[in-house]
Amino acid sequence: MVGILPLCCSGCVPSLCCSSYVPSVAPTAAHSVRVPHSAGHCGQRVLACSLPQVFLKPWIFVEHFSSWLSLELFSFLRYLGTLLCACGHRLREGLLLPCLLGVGSWLLFNNWTGGSWFSLHLQQVSLSQGSHVAAFLPEAIGPGVPVPVSGESTSAQQSHAGWQLSAEADACPSVLYSEVLEWNKNINTYTSFHDFCLILGIFLFCFVLAVIGLPYIKPGLSLSVALLWQSLILLSSLVQQDSQVHTWGCLFSTFTST
C-alpha cells in the first residue's frame, strides 16, 4: 500500500515534525509545504507521516476490505465449485460411488433390521416386566397371612405381620410404579432415537442414490461391484442378527445413561 507523505509546514524541521512521532520515517521523506509554522498544524499532521491511508480512516478500511472480500470470496467459491464438480465427475466415473451406495444401503438396512429386532426384544421384556408387576402387586396390597415368629404370642405375631404387610403395601407399589415409568421412558427414548437413525439412514441413502446418482454409474464393473457390495451387506446383516441386537442394546444403554 502506498503511504502518504508527511505534510509539514515551511518553518518545521522534518526530523522534529514527523520522525519524532514515527521513528521509522526518514527525515528526507517529509514534504515541506508553504504553510505558516504552528505547533497545532504539526500535531495534526503527524499521524499522516508515511502511514497507509487505509488504516487512517475506518470507512476506507471497510471499503477496501469489502471489495477484497467480494473479489476473493467469489473467486474462492467459484474455484471450490469447480473443484467439487470435478470431484463429482471423477466420483461418478470411479469405483467410490458403489462404496457410498453400499454404505447408504447398509445404514438403511441395519437401522431397519437391527432396530426392529431390538424393539421386539424390548416389547417382550416389557411384557414380562408388566406380568411380574401384575403378579406382585396383589401380594403387596392384599390381605396378609400371619407369619409365626418364635417367642411371640399369637396377637403379637398377627400385629407384627399386619405391620409388615402394611409397610410393603405402602412402599412396594410406589417403587414398582416408578420402575415401570422409568422403563417406559427408556422405551420411548429408544423409539425416538431409532426413528431418528432410520430417518437419517433413509435421507443418506436417497441423497447418495438420487443426487450423486445411479444414472451416472457406468455399466459393467461399477454396477457389478455395487451388486456384490449389496449382497455382502445383506448376507452379513442376515447372519449377525444376534450381534445386531447386542449392538443396539449397548447403544441404547449408552444413550440412556447419558
From Swiss-Prot:
Disulfide bonds: none
Primary localization class, coarse: membrane
Membrane-topology annotation of the record: Multi-pass membrane protein
Subcellular location: Membrane
Protein name: Uncharacterized protein KRT10-AS1
The organism's place on the tree of life at top rank: Eukaryota
Keyword Methyltransferase: no
Keyword 4Fe-4S: no
Protein keywords: Membrane, Signal, Transmembrane, Transmembrane helix
Transmembrane regions listed in the UniProt entry: 94-114, 197-217, 219-239
Signal peptide positions (record): 1-19
One GO CC annotation: membrane
